[in-house]
């Protein structure tokens, strides 16, 4: 299992290839554009840990911007008892959804996103649940 811990938008995020993550809005990025995250704090590749001080040199996590979206609405309600003061406000955080494509260290690709799970050629099971009649 290969994963990396990267720093983006002032937060640390554990990322694995082939998964998507919602991070704070990344200004200046467009949908379906490539993105290189170079602030890598740690890389674990099959049990071998590479730790940075604070960042791992020549380590890059390649990602692709899937979409810009907004998070779930958070309701903030302030009330002062016995005063009749009430305030109700909502907030939706702007987010960017990124797909992690690969983790690279010193120019070599350690892990990439799996395009599709391996299919079994012996998938001849009957999905109806009715046993076949014997002749």
UniProtKB/Swiss-Prot annotation:
A single cellular component GO annotation: cytoplasm
UniProt name for this protein: Large ribosomal subunit protein bL21
Residue numbers spanned by region Disordered: 109-135
Source organism phylogeny: Bacteria, Bacillati, Cyanobacteriota, Cyanophyceae, Synechococcales
Bias (Polar residues) ranges: 109-128
Gene name in the database record: rplU
PANTHER family named among the record's database cross-references: 50S RIBOSOMAL PROTEIN L21 (PTHR21349), LARGE RIBOSOMAL SUBUNIT PROTEIN BL21M (PTHR21349:SF0)
Originating species: Synechococcus sp. (strain JA-3-3Ab)
Similarity-based family: Belongs to the bacterial ribosomal protein bL21 family.
Pfam families xref list: Ribosomal_L21p (PF00829)
């Amino acid at each position: 299992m290969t994963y990396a811990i990267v720093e983006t938008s002032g937060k640390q995020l554990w990322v694995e290839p082939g998964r998507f993550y919602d991070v704070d809005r990344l200004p200046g990025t467009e949908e379906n554009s490539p993105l290189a995250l170079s602030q890598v704090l740690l890389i674990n590749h099959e049990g071998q840990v590479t730790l940075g001080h604070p960042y791992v040199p020549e380590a890059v996590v390649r990602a692709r911007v899937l979409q810009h979206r907004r998070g779930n609405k958070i309701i903030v309600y302030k009330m002062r008892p016995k005063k009749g003061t009430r305030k109700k406000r909502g907030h939706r955080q702007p987010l960017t959804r990124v797909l992690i494509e690969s983790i690279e260290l010193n120019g070599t690709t350690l892990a990439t996103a799996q395009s599709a799970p391996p299919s079994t050629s012996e998938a001849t099971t009957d999905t109806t649940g009715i046993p076949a009649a014997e002749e």
